[in-house]
């Protein structure tokens, strides 16, 4: 199954924007059942740093590693999740990026608003926010 998310980085998020993205994502991780790690075959912890958010699913529940950079302006990136359980964490990060660093990334997906809505609803409930989906979804 080729279910993929795409992002085209147009600008570098400020340190404050990136900090907010990291903090919201960490909050989500504390309040959801985690199914992510460094790589599908590497049980090391996922990576959340001042420049990257990087993770994959666990074992057979992983597919391609999600790696979002704060500093790769001009790069077109993608992550094929095959709609495996860690996909919701990819969607969480991309929704956060869209709302907290709105002019920095153009986000698209093989999925549509119906595919993303349950993850948006969960994110908004946990973070007590009213974030929106990217217009390109």
Residue ranges with predicted function:
Residues 1-137:
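Acidic (Asp/Glu-rich) sequence patches and key acidic residues
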